[in-house]
């Protein structure tokens, strides 16, 4: 296990998917003096509880772009790092049982299409074929998003950690941060 350095440009507290993703993305931007401190082992907190659903159609354009980026990243991460992520893309559908909800879904689809998320309206019959256990007799519309998927949060976190470490980040497990040091209202250090 690496020892905790005296200094680092960036210290990330927490080795779940969010903390490790931050380290991964910082190192992709060539900020490599990054240390991730995890009090237990990577993914030991809430990450391992997550369902890992990757749905790209969100309520705003910014969130839709972020979700689409995540889907692309998850597709490429295993090839980049050699670490399996469990990512698969069975697709998803959004359904509406009233006209107001159907109009909301269609507006979202127009926005998603504008940022490159593939989606298309499908008939109620096609929705029933794709998802035979779903009740469809009360539906007024259905939208199919073929690249939506699911990933293994634990495996994806490990792949992100491997990618971050390959670019220079340090990941240290079994080190608890007990205090944040502040100066003039800013965090300037941690106590372990």
Predicted regions and their residues:
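Gly/Ala-rich phosphate-binding loop of Rossmann-like dinucleotide-binding domains
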Residues: 23, 27, 163-165
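Helical element adjacent to the flavin cofactor pocket in flavoenzyme catalytic cores
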Residues: 143-192
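Short loop/edge segments at beta-strand edges and connector loops
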Residues: 38, 123, 173-175
């Amino acid at each position: 296990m690496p020892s905790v350095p005296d200094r680092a440009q960036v210290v990330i507290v927490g080795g779940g998917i969010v903390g490790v993703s931050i380290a991964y993305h910082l190192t992709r931007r060539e900020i490599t003096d990054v240390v991730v401190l995890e009090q237990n082992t990577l993914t030991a907190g809430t990450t391992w509880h997550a369902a890992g659903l990757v749905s790209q159609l969100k309520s705003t354009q910014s969130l839709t772009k972020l979700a689409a980026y995540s889907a692309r990243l998850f597709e490429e991460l295993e090839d980049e790092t050699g670490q399996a992520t469990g990512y698969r893309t069975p697709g998803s559908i959004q359904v509406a049982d009233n006209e107001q909800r159907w109009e909301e879904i269609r507006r979202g689809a127009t926005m998603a299409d504008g940022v490159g998320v593939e989606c298309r309206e499908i008939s109620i019959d096609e929705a029933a074929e794709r998802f035979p256990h779903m009740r469809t007799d009360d539906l007024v519309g259905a939208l199919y998003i073929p690249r939506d998927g699911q990933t293994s949060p634990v495996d994806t976190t490990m792949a992100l950690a491997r990618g971050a470490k390959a670019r220079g980040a340090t990941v240290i497990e079994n080190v608890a941060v007990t205090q944040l040091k502040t100066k003039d209202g800013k965090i300037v250090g941690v106590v372990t």
